[in-house]
Amino acid sequence: MTKLIFMGTPDFSATVLKGLLTDDRYEILAVVTQPDRAVGRKKVIQETPVKQAAKEAGLSIYQPEKLSGSPEMEDLMKLGADGIVTAAFGQFLPSKLLDSMDFAVNVHASLLPRHRGGAPIHYALIQGDEEAGVTIMEMVKEMDAGDMISRRSIPITDEDNVGTLFEKLALVGRDLLLDTLPAYIAGDIKPEPQDTSQVTFSPNIKPEEEKLDWNKTNRQLFNQIRGMNPWPVAHTFLKGDRFKIYEALPVEGQGNPGEILSIGKKELIVATAEGALSLKQVQPAGKPKMDIASFLNGVGRTLTVGERFGD
């Protein structure tokens, strides 16, 4: 039985962990995840999905603010683990820890070498990729730069957003890891170096990148909106107030970028640099998320054709 330390944080990681727990070829000696954080307006302390899954399984849990140089890292190195599996952990692993293991692999939610970094699923959508995927890779000191053990792709559809793609790729990652790990441990797979000429990066989304620029095409804005749904959520401004857009569809239309072209009972069409967007799910300032019909029947009922979104 191979003894593992698992490291991860969000739902994506929890799905991978649960997969490992169903396989009797592995024993999880410890789980490492990010510390509990205060979330939401009420600052409620929330455990990570990986911590919740580990508690349910009765596993030992470590939550260092920073793994490097921590007492927790020293404890982990004394457990006698054969290897480490990480999936969206959110911290760099010190070389000292990596070197103490027979192997260390990462489940990364992109088709490397494309989209190295912390937001690969967001960028796959924002940049209009036709496919997404998961790469199982060896861990090295440089971020997401290790040799590739295996890859598996799925198509991206127009119905996908960050939430749906996270769910799909979590299952892909779980299955790919379970399919790949035994042969890798046995030495039957020769990892493939990444083509450095094809590397792209997907750093965490910055707040200024959430703002919509109506001078882009309808397709570019469509991709940006779904590439930030359900988090961090794209926004614009309406009458000086922040206005979040969760869902929109590209449609035909022509006008000044940001201009309202038409208003119906269940339809609000806004011009872009090329074509237009039909807004479907929005959140006005100080209000909950709502469908466009609810918005137009409520706070949006005073809108008129010709008014503009934007600064």
Curated annotation (Swiss-Prot):
This is Methionyl-tRNA formyltransferase. The keyword Secreted does not apply. It comes from Streptococcus pneumoniae serotype 4 (strain ATCC BAA-334 / TIGR4). Keywords: Protein biosynthesis, Transferase. Attaches a formyl group to the free amino group of methionyl-tRNA(fMet). The formyl group appears to play a dual role in the initiator identity of N-formylmethionyl-tRNA by promoting its recognition by IF2 and preventing the misappropriation of this tRNA by the elongation apparatus. Belongs to the Fmt family. Pfam families: Formyl_trans_C, Formyl_trans_N. One of its GO terms (molecular function) is methionyl-tRNA formyltransferase activity. Its EC number is 2.1.2.9. The keyword Manganese does not apply. It catalyses: L-methionyl-tRNA(fMet) + (6R)-10-formyltetrahydrofolate = N-formyl-L-methionyl-tRNA(fMet) + (6S)-5,6,7,8-tetrahydrofolate + H(+). It is an enzyme of class 2 (transferase). (6S)-5,6,7,8-tetrahydrofolate binds at residues 110-113. One of its GO terms (cellular component) is cytosol.
